[in-house]
Amino acid sequence: MTPIKSTTRKTLTYSRCNVDKGYTDLYLDVDLSAGTIATGPIEEKIKKTFIGGKGFDLWLLWDALKGDNKWNDPQNAICIASGPMGGTPAYPGSGKSIVTSISPLTGSVIDSNVGGYFGPYLKFSGFDALRITGKTKGDTVVVIDGIEEKIDILQIPGLPEDAYALSDVLTDHFSQGKKVGISVISAGPGAANTRIGCLNFSWYDNARKRVRYKQAGRGGIGTVFADKGLKAVVARWEQVSLKTNNPADLEALKTVARCHSKEIVELDPKQNEMARLGTVHLVPIMNDFDLLPTHNFQYGSHPGASLIGREAFEKLFDPGYDGCWKGCTVACAHGVKDFVPYTGAYKGRKVFVDGPEYETIAGCGSNLGIFDPFTILEINFYCDAYGLDTISVGTSIAFVMECFERGLIN
């Protein structure tokens, strides 16, 4: 266990609600300014109207705000929710959750979809949704422990800055030897110093014995997270089965899950090849349809597209089953093992790069005139480590490059 010293600002102990038909009927409310932790009811009318996920997020965000609130006001909330099917093993895509807030980029509401274990672990710990408001000094970590049935607001100074090192330390510290039971949300120094910050959602890949990541990338929600003084949010849970959600009709759920999984297993190899390639399969398709962003999307295709497409990354991806939730047959998460960055803080060290996804390849590759997969991997790695949205990074740099080419800047 990694030794860390923490000061407890607030603790709430609770009796965990059992999930019934996919719901706990409670949300968790953390106010960082007041240093308070509370729970609130989710009534039947709210469930029928908003269902879960984005709906619950918008309801909780609306309830927290006044009409003139800005993204960096303490009243702005970060809301995270799964849904009634969330956390169902072997049901494709059920590890997903939605993150919602006011965007520092648009000043309007933004939501971002993210995979991993946090959404399910939050629900199984007793809460259909999480709302975080207020602000605090830095180094704040919120811990939701569904096993010990307590929530802590901690001050932990001296934690690593980048998301990779931070998630490793917190997973090690809070896991009590069962790392697969921990999911960490974090941003990074890039999120704290720009308006294009992303959030990293971790899960522990037991087969590969390493912490892995998915990103809530769009809209600058990582910037909101950092502005609140949050270092991380940690969820802890244990075993999950088809019965954990206590579905209304377990046999019907099994039947539908088998049907979906069978179709995916049969059809995916002939169509999208998500389990083998992930979203990388889109590169040649978009190039053929003149839709591959190239040179700030002045063009839609490029002869070098094959250098950053399916053939290139199929050789680089770590082989074997992958995926960011238990038993998901889409299994679209992929990564590159033992990549060695050429630059930066990790120069010369072997790292595992989660991705790249198609949007990263297009945004930080062809859109910048880069047709080298290793350069794209390096950009991908450091954007994630520092909490920067790869799409925003790629499109911003591409815009500046075209401005320079046209003589608008020097």
Model-inferred region functions:
Residues 2-113, 117-410:
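Intrinsically disordered, low-complexity segments enriched in small residues
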